[in-house]
């Protein structure tokens, strides 16, 4: 869905970008439809994907077990940061040097985690959970809820790029609740082994905590203990709310 003021060239550019990414990743686009919709200020894209895998290759988040380590692969908030740059590039250009924003744009191709998932499938990972809308805090909750387990994690071990922190500070956003597609939580009894294997491939990975019996979901930060809350709305929603208020 596109705003009524969007040009046809915008739709064509979106389809070219989708086609290029699919070609690079060995995917096919079977069908695409588009329409102009009143009342929206930005393009909305819905994707339905279909794939096949052997049963033993499926590593659903509900397969996580208590007593295993939680490994965070890649950086939290990266996708959200790139989307903020696209939405608020002009505002950010007033605060940051061009080299800063160009460096972030160069990271766009690095958010994909397909290689990391291949490695995980061969290294004893019992469960995986992608970090999407709502950020890592939502992903941790959803993973624990789906598996019926608890967890204990440390915020200081969660990998986040300094650029993401600085962009979030401009708009007073929480990077831990920012959409993070491309980052993945992996649960394994051999966390250190998996981390080192991924790092040898140049893939950022850190052990951020472990799963536990029961339902307590604990986050440690600054020496303080707190309990993980139910997922809050993604911080990107605040960006769109700000844009709507400006345009109102």
Region spans (language model):
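General beta-strand structural signal in soluble alpha/beta enzymes
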Residues: 28-33, 49, 72-73, 127-131, ...
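Active-site-proximal betaalpha loop/short-helix elements
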Residues: 3-6, 105-179
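Short, compositionally biased
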Residues: 82-101
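Active-site glycine-rich loop that binds ribose-phosphate moieties when present
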Residues: 46-60, 95-119
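Acidic, Ser/Thr/Pro-rich beta/coil linker or hinge segments at domain junctions
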Residues: 201-248
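Helix N-cap motif at beta-to-alpha junctions
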Residues: 187-193
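Glycine-rich anion-binding loops of enzyme active sites
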Residues: 1-85, 210
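Solvent-exposed alpha-helices and their adjacent loops that cap or buttress functional pockets
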Residues: 22, 37-42, 61-65, 118-122, ...
């Amino acid at each position: 869905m596109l705003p009524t003021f969007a040009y046809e060239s915008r739709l064509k550019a979106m389809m070219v970008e989708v086609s290029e990414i699919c070609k690079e990743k060995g995917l096919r686009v079977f069908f695409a439809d588009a329409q102009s919709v009143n009342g929206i200020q930005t393009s909305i894209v819905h994707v339905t994907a279909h794939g096949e895998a052997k049963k033993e290759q499926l590593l659903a988040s509900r397969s996580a077990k208590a007593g295993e380590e939680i490994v965070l692969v890649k950086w939290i908030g990266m996708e959200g940061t790139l989307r903020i740059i696209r939405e608020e590039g002009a505002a950010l250009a007033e605060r940051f040097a061009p080299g800063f924003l160009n460096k972030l744009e160069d990271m766009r191709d690095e958010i994909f985690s397909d290689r990391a998932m291949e490695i995980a499938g061969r290294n004893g990972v019992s469960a995986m959970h992608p970090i999407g809308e709502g950020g890592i805090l939502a992903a941790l909750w959803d993973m624990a809820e789906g598996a019926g387990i608890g967890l204990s994690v440390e915020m200081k071990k969660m990998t986040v790029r300094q650029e993401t922190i600085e962009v979030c500070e401009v708009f007073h956003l929480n990077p831990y609740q920012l959409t993070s597609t491309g980052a993945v939580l992996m649960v394994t009894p051999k966390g250190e082994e998996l981390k080192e294997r991924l790092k040898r491939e140049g893939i950022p990975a850190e052990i951020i905590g472990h799963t536990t019996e029961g339902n307590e979901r604990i986050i440690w930060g600054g020496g303080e203990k707190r309990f993980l809350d139910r997922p809050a709305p993604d911080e990107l929603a605040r960006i769109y709310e700000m844009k709507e208020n400006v345009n109102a």
